[in-house]
Amino acid sequence: MNITTILFDLDGTLLPMDQEAFTTGYFKSLAKKLAPYGYEPKSLVDAIWAGTAAMVKNDGSCTNEQAFWKKFAAIYGEEKCQSDQGLFEDFYANEFNAARDICGFNPASVETVHKLKECGYRVALATNPIFPHMATENRIRWAGLTPEDFEIYTTYETSTFCKPNPAYYLEVARSLGAAPEECLM
């Protein structure tokens, strides 16, 4: 079987970054945004990590979004989570974009994605689906690309597994209607 589909990672691949510096800057910005609403910074970061762990352990019975918020609600309470969800959405639409300054830029990323598409390959973004679509779309733009450059891109709303679970890659292939052996990561 021939390779028909190219899957790219985002963080550290299409979007150059020091993962530790990015995570530190991202959490600092999120904590600053949410502190006035009763979120103590260290507790918030711990809760985000707990929600992330819940997504990584997701068995496919729910979306990663549902796994995250279930864990987050267990820490902060269902009512607070529901009332404050808009604060998180506003953060990803606005303050999150300051993290772009922490990331690098590689024009070869844009050139490579476009060239592969010109050559007839299907191109998908198989980034670890631990972020909402808005954050993923922003990071795609930071790399000089657009969401439309990809046939699909994974987010916590649309995925039920995370890396490194092999089921994540099968889920991506199924979403594309491609056989796993047709895909190159």
Predicted segments with their positions:
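Active-site neighborhood of HAD-like aspartate-dependent phosphohydrolases
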Residues: M1-A50
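Substrate-recognition element of Asp-dependent hydrolases with the DxDx(T/V) motif
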Residues: D90-A93, N97-F105, S109-A143
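Short, solvent-exposed loop/turn segments at secondary-structure boundaries
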Residues: D18-A21, D59-G60, R100, P164
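Substrate-recognition "cap/lid" segment bordering the active-site pocket of phosphatases
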Residues: A124-L184
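Hydrophobic alpha-helical core bundles mediating ligand binding, dimerization, or RNAP-core interactions
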Residues: T23-A31, I48-A53, W69, F88-F96, ...
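A metal-dependent, Asp-based hydrolase signature
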Residues: V45-N94
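Short glycine/proline-centered loop/turn elements that form peptide/ligand docking sites
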Residues: L14, S83-Q85, V110-K115
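A ubiquitous short alpha-helical element
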Residues: T13-Q19, A53-K57, R122-A124
